[in-house]
From Swiss-Prot:
PANTHER family recorded: VALINE--TRNA LIGASE, CHLOROPLASTIC_MITOCHONDRIAL 2, VALYL-TRNA SYNTHETASES
Residue ranges of the motif 'KMSKS' region: 524-528
Keyword field contains Nucleotide-binding: yes
Swiss-Prot/TrEMBL domain comment: ValRS has two distinct active sites: one for aminoacylation and one for editing. The misactivated threonine is translocated from the active site to the editing site.
Name recorded for this polypeptide: Valine--tRNA ligase
UniProtKB keywords: Aminoacyl-tRNA synthetase, ATP-binding, Coiled coil, Cytoplasm, Ligase, Nucleotide-binding, Protein biosynthesis
Predominant location category: cytoplasm
Record-linked InterPro entries: aa-tRNA-synth_I_CS, aa-tRNA-synth_Ia, Anticodon_Ia_Val, M/V/L/I-tRNA-synth_anticd-bd, Rossmann-like_a/b/a_fold, tRNA-bd_arm, tRNAsynth_Ia_anticodon-bd, Val-tRNA_synth_C_sf
Gene it is expressed from: valS
Length: 882
């Protein structure tokens, strides 16, 4: 890849990106560099579910990771970015069941083994789709190390962790209330339950006291669970019911006697202050039942139909039973009233059905000891660093209030629980391997929650439980995890405590938290709103580099991003600007050698010194911002340097030399252009891998790919404050004259007189020394630079730092319009002065900010005040002339 090729005349992202990824793969550029002296840097990709195509959130998440990986690779680190996918138990099984249902087939028709074969076929199909999407995004993943959560090695790790926790008493089997999906017929974790507002009602029911002395009124939204009531609860301090505690009521319709109990769980100010307690169908009621030793009566089957404990309602669907029970309560005089209301109801994320709280025998992880260990680790120098820091509070709050984790799922797709039951004795055996006399045992049919295996992802993918595995020793703990704030508890926290428990190390040094991708109106993207965006369609239109630029340059850690086609247009335009500027530079390089060395100071003119100083500052800023994960600010820094400094100013200034006759100056300018372009492409490469590779291959270079070229470094000798000061003054002057021309509709072809009234003496030397330079860019009829100049009566005026610019345009000047413009400028300057005054009056700023920063703000205020006086004076002159 060392010979350069000619760039096409137009930027076409499809042409640029097509085939490039395969070139990288063929060259094995995504693998670690295998240099034992290089410092390792590793990231494991958050494994996407094999349920379908990736969305914009995945594109954002993986682009941030790829930026880090590509930069570290260029900085000489031994880099590993490990890819993989998650089997996504219930999500994938639900998809396959839905597909089979279209053919009129259920999983039960196929049986467990054949159904799992169907799921593997699904996995292979969608894994191929995900691979294709990763390639189109340009992700530099080491596919030789790709993992899947059901791989043999990862399955070994899962069994070892389960057995170890079980032997420590941290995994147990018990009867508890869990979230239940009656369609999928499985337990759900909290994250698999989506809450939405449904229309419902409060049904007020009279429960008669058994002794005939009266009744007690309760209100419920779930009359279908009434057959499972085993008590009425009131608050111990509620005087209304004090004399009723200890008595009993007769359960309406069921004719069963249940006690009235006192429990602090009851809110005496809510509703009637009396609650029906159904321990088998509500988690809070379950806890109340435990405290009072109440029986647990389950009145529903797995499919949410009523069972024999529901009496005459046996066999009815739960919602049919609700109607029937309400009708019977009304007919028998127990129904007092019905108050319609809207309330939040949990629904299965995968099947959409209303979730039931169900009493079930499940496997659980005892969370308190593990959570305490994770919290204690956050007080050490081996803590996991959250970016932004505020998300550590989120993590801490969740860990301090954690409940035991139900890990069993009534599914077929997943890691089957390594527990067996003896067919004759019922004895339970838990182990990494099946019992030797397996014919006498039956394995637990449940599988583990998907989060159980993904909690082991950072170390199981590296070869653990073999702690001598080369990758585990070299690349674990990993350096950075990139993920969304919505799964801090469900995934991030579990990786932390499992890693600490089994490796005694944190799983990663930093967690970079990003937000959600929203539409232009700020709404979350969803199927129901129909506002989802397919990243592949965006790439087809704009290219991957433009999408990557949009996703990163507009992002701030922890904040959401709004997708916008207008911003995508801007991203494409920026790349097109880079393309055209690069093409101009390359077309003018001729036999210029590869820019492998920093340009020599003796060969630099003022513009060269300035652009190299600006480049040097950009390198320092972007490197620092990347280290702090401030990709949005890094993007803005790059944009300003490339668009403004390099393209709009330096290249335009370079043309004056390139089109001249001084061959030595031309050669020096060509080399400097090549050097700045080369360094700029390297800075851009982590975020725009395709177009930077294409341009780099088209210019003189050494090495096979920009991906393995060294990342730009700061060179102290390139810092040139004097050149920066001079060029900033010249640019301000040229820009001010151009603005005057634009406002007066005076094109460059029309010569104009220009007077520069110097107020800051050092400017005199700068402008005088560079008068020829100024004239080339402002095209004056005459140019006068002096102190004490008087503004012509009718002239356009521009105020720059240290000088006033007058352009006599009597025949073109609209006096009223100029007065209005200067009044606006006066208002703007007044706002800047007040802002600076407010900042300097803030002791928090003056006491804490570096003295250099405070002094810069004082200088700004003084400059604004001087400009204000100049504008005010000029305004008075024009008003007098009117």
């Amino acid at each position: 890849m060392t010979d350069h090729k000619e760039m096409s005349t137009k930027y076409d992202p499809n042409q640029v990106e097509d085939g490039r990824y395969q070139d990288w793969l063929k060259e094995d550029l995504f693998k670690p560099n295998a240099n034992p002296d290089a410092k390792p840097y590793s990231i494991v990709i958050p494994p996407p579910n094999v349920t379908g195509k990736l969305h914009l959130g995945h594109a954002w998440d993986t682009t941030l990771q790829d930026m880090l990986i590509r930069q570290k690779r260029m900085q000489g680190y031994d880099v590993l970015w490990l890819p993989g996918m998650d089997h996504a138990g219930i999500a994938t099984q639900a998809k396959v069941e839905a597909k089979l249902a279209e053919q009129g087939i259920s999983r039960y028709d196929l049986g467990r083994e054949k159904f799992i074969d169907q799921v593997w076929e699904w996995k292979d199909e969608y894994a191929a789709t995900i691979h294709d999407q990763w390639a189109k995004m340009g992700l530099s993943l080491d596919y030789s190390r790709e993992r899947f959560t059901l791989d043999d090695g990862l399955s070994d790790a899962v069994r070892k962790v389960f057995v170890n926790l079980y032997n420590k008493g941290l995994i147990y089997r018990g009867e508890y209330i869990i979230n239940w999906d009656p369609k999928a017929r499985t337990a759900l974790s909290d994250i698999e339950v989506l809450h939405q507002d449904d229309e419902g009602a409060f049904y007020h029911v009279s429960y008669p006291l058994t002794d005939g002395s009266g009744s007690i009124e309760i209100a419920t939204t779930r009359p279908e669970t009434l057959p499972g009531d085993t008590a009425i609860a009131v608050h111990p301090d509620d005087e209304r019911y004090a004399d009723l505690v200890g008595k009993t009521v007769t359960l309406p319709l069921m004719n069963r006697e249940i006690p009235i109990i006192a429990d602090h769980y009851v809110d005496k100010d809510f509703g009637t202050g009396a609650l029906k307690i159904t321990p088998a169908h509500d988690p809070n009621d379950f806890e109340v039942g435990n405290r009072h030793d109440l029986p647990r009566i389950n009145v529903m089957n797995e499919d949410a139909s009523m069972n024999e404990s529901a009496g005459k309602y046996n066999g009815m669907d739960r919602f049919e039973a609700r109607k029937a029970i309400v009708a019977d309560l009304k007919e028998q005089g127990f129904l007092i009233k019905v108050d319609p209301m809207t309330h939040s109801v949990g629904h299965s994320e995968r099947t959409g059905v209303q979730v039931e709280a169900r009493l079930s025998t499940q496997w659980f992880v005892k969370m308190k000891p593990l959570a305490e260990m994770a919290l204690k680790n956050q007080e050490t120098d081996q803590k996991v660093n959250f970016v932004p820091e505020r998300f550590e509070n989120t993590f801490t709050q969740w860990m301090e209030n954690v409940h035991d984790w139900v890990i069993s799922r009534q599914l077929w797709w997943g890691h089957q629980i390594p527990a067996w039951y003896h067919k004759q004795t019922g004895e339970m055996y838990v182990g990494e391997e099946a019992p030797e006399d397996i014919e006498n045992w039956t394995q637990d049919s449940d599988v583990l929650d998907t989060w159980f295996s993904s909690a082991l992802w950072p170390f199981s993918t590296m070869g653990w439980p073999n702690t001598e595995a080369p990758d585990f020793k070299r690349y674990f703990p990993t350096n950075t995890l990139v993920t969304g704030y919505d799964i801090i508890f469900f995934w991030v926290s579990r990786m932390i405590f499992q890693s600490l428990e089994f490796t005694e190390q944190r799983p990663f040094e930093h967690v970079l938290i990003h937000g959600l991708i929203r539409d232009e109106q700020g709404r979350k993207m969803s199927k129901s709103l129909g506002n989802g965006i397919d990243p592949m369609e965006v790439i087809e239109k704009y290219g991957a580099d433009a999408l990557r630029w949009f996703l990163t340059s507009g992002s701030t850690p922890g904040q959401d991003v709004r997708f916008s086609y207008t911003k995508m247009d801007a991203a494409w335009n920026f790349i097109n600007k880079i393309w055209n500027a690069s093409r101009f530079v390359i077309m003018n390089l001729e036999d210029t050698p590869a820019p492998t060395k920093v340009p020599e100071a003796a060969n630099l003119d003022l513009t060269d010194k300035w652009i190299l100083s600006q480049l040097n500052q950009t390198v320092a800023d972007v490197t620092r911002l990347y280290e702090g994960f401030e990709f949005g600010e890094a993007g803005r820094t790059l944009y300003n340097f490339i668009w403004n400094d390099f393209c709009d100013w330096y290249i335009e200034m370079a043309k004056e030399v390139l089109y001249g006759d001084d061959q030595e100056a031309i050669a020096n300018k060509r080399y400097n252009l090549a050097y700045v372009l080369d360094q700029t492409l390297r800075l851009l490469h982590p975020v725009m891998p395709f177009v930077t590779e294409e341009i780099w291959q088209s210019m003189p270079h050494t090495g096979e790919s920009i991906m393995t070229a060294s990342y730009p470094e700061v060179h102290a000798e390139l810092d040139d404050q004097e050149a920066t000061t001079q060029m900033n003054a010249l640019i301000d002057l040229i820009r001010s004259v151009r603005n005057i021309r634009s406002e007066a509709n005076a094109p460059l072809s029309k010569p104009i007189d220009i007077l520069i009234n110097i107020q800051d003496t050092p400017l005199m030397a700068i402008f005088k020394q560079n008068q020829d330079f100024i004239e080339r860019f402002v095209h004056p009829k005459s140019l006068e630079i002096a102190e004490g100049l008087t503004a012509p009566a009718l002239a356009k005026t521009a105020i720059i730092s240290g000088a006033e610019v007058y352009v006599p345009l009597a025949e073109l000047l609209d006096l009223d319009e100029e007065i209005t413009r200067l009044e606006g400028e006066l208002k703007r300057l007044n706002g800047e002065i007040k802002r600076a005054q407010g900042k300097l009056a803030n002791k928090g700023f003056t006491d804490r900010a570096p003295e250099k920063v405070v002094q810069e703000e004082r200088d700004k205020q003084a400059d604004y005040e001087q400009q204000y006086q100049s504008v005010e004076k000029r305004l008075a002159e024009l008003k007098a002339a009117r």
